[in-house]
Regions:
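GST-like domain detector, emphasizing the conserved glutathione-binding G-site
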Residues: 1-141, 145
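Acidic carboxylate-rich catalytic motifs and surrounding loops in phosphoryl-/glycosyl-chemistry enzymes
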Residues: 40-46, 194-202
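Acidic, serine/threonine/proline-rich low-complexity intrinsically disordered regions
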Residues: 117, 165-174
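Hydrophobic packing residues in well-ordered alpha-helices of helical domains and bundles
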Residues: 120-123, 172, 179
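Structural signal for well-ordered, non-membrane alpha-helices
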Residues: 127-131, 161, 187
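GST superfamily/GST-like fold recognition
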Residues: 144-166, 178, 186
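A contiguous, mid-protein "functional segment" used to position or interact
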Residues: 174-200
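C-terminal helix/juxtamembrane-tail motif
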Residues: 200-213
Length: 213
């Protein structure tokens, strides 16, 4: 029986899969574990009553497991690992924090209006550290196999690449060869393409935050 999962609909296009990296993380987990699922698209700008009844906080993703609705991508991924242990996506503890500061650094730089506030350099250092990690331990975060760390990181890298190029005319430095190889491998993969929002929806999704900062 397919699991039901509520995910973000594209801004301005309620019938199209949206751009939430946390939703994509869960969808990628389901894809990697080959767990059948059906998606319910939620317009976060006009949340339907049925959605607020199952999750009063109004956040996505939310997934129905054993007749219970579960929120929060960290919690969901943990439950999926317990319920569907094969293939294992457990990240070895020594690699669990790889890239954990990347997304906050990206958001600070993206929304910054001061070119001298250090946010660009902070993001550069995070990307550099990830590139060096992949050089030493790749091709994936934990070596030769895909783990939960990859499935959390890759959707965020997708947003970083699209949003910064559009809003800041900023690209991930070409010198980060291992990082570029990593994203190229993932972004062209069938499961990633199936579960990612379109480029224009990523841009629309960030526009409000950028313009209001």
């Amino acid at each position: 029986m397919a699991l039901e999962i509520c995910v973000k609909a594209a801004t301005g296009a309620p019938d199209v899969l949206g751009d939430c990296p946390f939703c994509q993380r869960v969808l990628l987990t389901l894809e990697e574990k080959k767990v059948p699922y059906t998606t319910k698209l939620v317009d976060l700008g006009n949340k339907p009553q049925w959605f607020l009844e199952i999750n009063p906080e109004g956040k996505v993703p939310v997934i129905k497991i054993d007749d219970k609705w579960v929120a929060d991508s960290d919690v969901i991924v943990g439950i999926l690992e317990e319920k569907y242990p094969e293939p294992s996506l457990v990240t070895p503890s020594e690699f669990a924090s790889v890239g954990s500061k990347l997304f906050p650094s990206f958001v600070k730089f993206l929304t910054s209006k001061d070119p001298n506030d250090g946010t660009e350099q902070a993001l550069f250092e995070e990307l550099k550290a990830l590139d060096e990690h992949l050089k030493a331990h790749g091709p994936f975060v934990a070596g030769d196999r895909v783990t939960a760390a990859d499935l959390s990181l890759v959707p965020k890298l997708y947003h970083i690449e699209i949003a910064l190029e559009h809003f800041k005319k900023w690209k991930v430095p070409t010198e980060f060869d291992h990082l570029h190889n990593y994203t190229k491998l993932w972004f062209s993969g069938e499961s990633f393409v199936k579960t990612s929002g379109k480029k224009e929806h990523v841009i629309t999704g960030w526009a409000t935050k950028v313009n209001s900062s």
